[in-house]
């Protein structure tokens, strides 16, 4: 098949490859075309750096996919930039780059204008005109990025779970605005938030300046639950959902909340706690379900069932199917989940390759059966 490789200069190279080619082979082909030694090449696809020993198929790279080529320069190096939110950015630089260049690279990656960036290394603020070498910044050093906001400032909000959120605010922001920013970041409705500073609960209509809250102050966030509590719901896929509930909520209400979060109709939900299936008309209190209890969610499918599909990479996908589904339908469901076109899928069960026109029932595939997915790569076309 053909794939494309795009360089940082914007040039695009076309390569003839097979799905079974490993990344080392691909780098050798790039060397043949462009003369760039493999050890100076870094290949990126879907935001991931590709490892030499893995194959194109491992990364689900298909015909006409585009890889990005970044040069790893001798005399060049990688450094890391850590933001106050804890995010780490990786930059390709040279010792001779000045701080202004580095800020431009950060702008390219993160969209933050250089004049709002302050870079700190070994406790010192770095000056634009100086170079990385001047500050003895070497490969894999970590710089710290602090934002310089016009009239603005950063404050921190600490939750009861110990998590710290960073907010960009101005002194003239009122507490209501701050709660809205917290909602944007964390999804907690303002009317469930209580903010505490210096032991005082903050009132919505007052501003940060009214409370003498200055840059890098820390507020404490307490959740105001109306006689309420949090419980957890664990699905068969291992995902855990957090719900805000009250002891007086009945099981039907809980299923409605799960539908709001996950889109699963209540009549397809079975909830289990302490080994018992919960009945719709009963309340959480009836079952002695208390704060931070974990319920288990099992899907009840109309004539339906769950099956598993295992890929060559070892990943297992869960599908909701019915015995009357034909193999073509199943491949479409896999495409919806994984993006793999049906014509590149071969499904194997009990050692047999499954034919598109036949149904799951034809092959006696029952609930919780495991199919194996093999990719069919069209040779080198």
Curated annotation (Swiss-Prot):
For this UniProt entry, the molecular function terms from Gene Ontology, in alphabetical order, are: protein tag activity; ubiquitin protein ligase binding
Q: Mind telling me which InterPro entries this protein's record contains?
A: Ubiquitin-like_dom (IPR000626), Ubiquitin-like_domsf (IPR029071), Ubiquitin_CS (IPR019954), Ubiquitin_dom (IPR019956), Ubiquitin_ubiquitin-like (IPR050158)
Q: What else is known?
A: Ubiquitin is synthesized as a polyubiquitin precursor with exact head to tail repeats. Some ubiquitin genes contain a single copy of ubiquitin fused to a ribosomal protein. In D.discoideum there are 9 genes: ubqA: 5 copies of Ub and a final Asn; ubqB: 1 copy of Ub and ribosomal protein eL40; ubqC: 1 copy of Ub and ribosomal protein eS31; ubqD: 3 copies of Ub and a final Leu; ubqF: 7 copies of Ub and a final Asn; ubqG: 5 copies of Ub and a final Leu; ubqH: 5 copies of Ub and a final Asn; ubqI: 4 copies of Ub and a final Asn; ubqJ: 4 copies of Ub and a final Asn. For the sake of clarity sequence features are annotated only for the first chain, and are not repeated for each of the following chains.
Q: Where is this cross-link: Glycyl lysine isopeptide (Gly-Lys) (interchain with K-? in acceptor proteins)?
A: 76
Alphabetically list the UniProt keywords. Answer: Cytoplasm, Isopeptide bond, Nucleus, Repeat, Ubl conjugation
User: Where does this protein chiefly localize?
Assistant: cytoplasm
Where in or outside the cell it occurs: the entry states:
Cytoplasm; Nucleus
Q: Which GO terms describe its cellular component?
A: cytoplasm; nucleus
* Glycyl lysine isopeptide (Lys-Gly) (interchain with G-Cter in ubiquitin) crosslink residues: 48
**Similarity comment:** Belongs to the ubiquitin family.
Does the keyword Ubl conjugation feature in the UniProt annotation? yes
What Pfam families does this protein's entry cite? ubiquitin
Per the UniProt entry, the propeptide covers 381
> Could you tell me what this protein does?
Ubiquitin exists either covalently attached to another protein, or free (unanchored). When covalently bound, it is conjugated to target proteins via an isopeptide bond either as a monomer (monoubiquitin), a polymer linked via different Lys residues of the ubiquitin (polyubiquitin chains) or a linear polymer linked via the initiator Met of the ubiquitin (linear polyubiquitin chains). Polyubiquitin chains, when attached to a target protein, have different functions depending on the Lys residue of the ubiquitin that is linked: Lys-48-linked is involved in protein degradation via the proteasome.
GO terms under biological process: modification-dependent protein catabolic process; protein ubiquitination
Protein name (Swiss-Prot/TrEMBL) = Polyubiquitin-A
In what residue span(s) does the Ubiquitin-like domain sit?
1-76, 77-152, 153-228, 229-304, 305-380
Write down the SUPFAM superfamilies for this protein, in alphabetical order: Ubiquitin-like
């Amino acid at each position: 098949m053909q794939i494309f490789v795009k360089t940082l200069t914007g040039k695009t190279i076309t390569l003839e490859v097979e799905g079974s080619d490993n990344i080392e082979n691909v780098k050798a082909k790039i060397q043949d075309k462009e003369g760039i030694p493999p050890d100076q090449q870094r290949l990126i696809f879907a935001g991931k750096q590709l490892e030499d020993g893995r194959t194109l198929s491992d990364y689900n790279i298909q015909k006409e996919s585009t890889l990005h080529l970044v040069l790893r320069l001798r005399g060049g190096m990688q450094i890391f930039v850590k933001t106050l939110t804890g995010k780490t950015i990786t930059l390709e630089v040279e010792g001779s780059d000045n701080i202004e260049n580095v800020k431009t690279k950060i702008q390219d990656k993160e969209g933050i204008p250089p004049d709002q960036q302050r870079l700190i290394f070994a406790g010192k603020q770095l000056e634009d005109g100086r170079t990385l070498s001047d500050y003895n910044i070497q490969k894999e050093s970590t710089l710290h990025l602090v934002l310089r906001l016009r009239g603005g400032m950063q404050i921190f909000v600490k939750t009861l779970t110990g998590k710290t959120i960073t907010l960009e605010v101005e002194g003239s922001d009122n507490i209501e605005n701050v709660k809205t920013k917290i909602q944007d970041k964390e999804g907690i409705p303002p009317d469930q938030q209580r903010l505490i500073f210096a032991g005082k609960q903050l009132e919505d209509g007052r501003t940060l300046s009214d409370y003498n809250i200055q840059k890098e102050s820390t507020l404490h966030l307490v959740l105001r639950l109306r006689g309420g509590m949090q419980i957890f719901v664990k699905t068969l896929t291992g995902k855990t959902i957090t719900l805000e509930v009250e002891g007086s909520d009945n099981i039907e209400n809980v299923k409605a909340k799960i539908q709001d979060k996950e889109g699963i109709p209540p009549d397809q939900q079975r909830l289990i706690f302490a080994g018992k299936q919960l009945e719709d008309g009963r309340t959480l209190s009836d079952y002695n379900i208390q704060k931070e209890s974990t319920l288990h969610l099992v899907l009840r499918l109309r004539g339906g069932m769950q099956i598993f599909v295992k890929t060559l990479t070892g990943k297992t996908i869960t599908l909701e199917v019915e015995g009357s589904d034909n193999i073509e339908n199943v491949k479409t469901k896999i495409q919806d989940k994984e993006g793999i076109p049906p014509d590149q899928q071969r499904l194997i069960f009990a050692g047999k390759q499954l034919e598109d026109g036949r149904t799951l029932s034809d092959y006696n595939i029952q609930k919780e059966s495991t199919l194996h997915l093999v990719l069919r790569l069209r040779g080198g076309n």
